[in-house]
Amino acid sequence: MTRNDKRRIRHKRIVKKIRLTNLNNRVVLIVIKSLKNISVQAWDFSKNVVLTSSSSLQLKLKNGNKENAKLVGMDIATKLIKLNQKDVVFDTGGSKYHGRIAALAEGARAKGLNF
């Protein structure tokens, strides 16, 4: 089993838990990480629609390192606060909560999002 297969299995398990326990219909932040960039989408599963998104490509950042991931987190937080969505559920996309994923979460928390 490859590393990517393991990540997909983890992600299915995470999504299943989120859908079962998200009884308040909070917005879900889904993180997509590639080797060079990082992006995040804010999903509302009750309406099945993406509310807003942000990425290192959209912000025209050179790479997806920790500092830029923190900026992406701050950007998505400001967009969600404008939409009056402060309480969210964080979905790591099957990746471990470490490095760029953790930096993105710290940036979002610094701007006022509650996980």
From Swiss-Prot:
Keyword rRNA-binding annotated: yes
Single biological process term from Gene Ontology: translation
MF terms in GO: 5S rRNA binding; structural constituent of ribosome
Keyword check for Ribosomal protein: yes
Cellular component GO terms, alphabetical: cytosolic large ribosomal subunit
Keywords annotated in UniProt: Ribonucleoprotein, Ribosomal protein, RNA-binding, rRNA-binding
Superkingdom in the source lineage: Bacteria
NCBIfam families documented for this protein: L18_bact
Name of the featured protein: Large ribosomal subunit protein uL18
Organism for this UniProt entry: Mycoplasma genitalium (strain ATCC 33530 / DSM 19775 / NCTC 10195 / G37) (Mycoplasmoides genitalium)
Originating gene: rplR
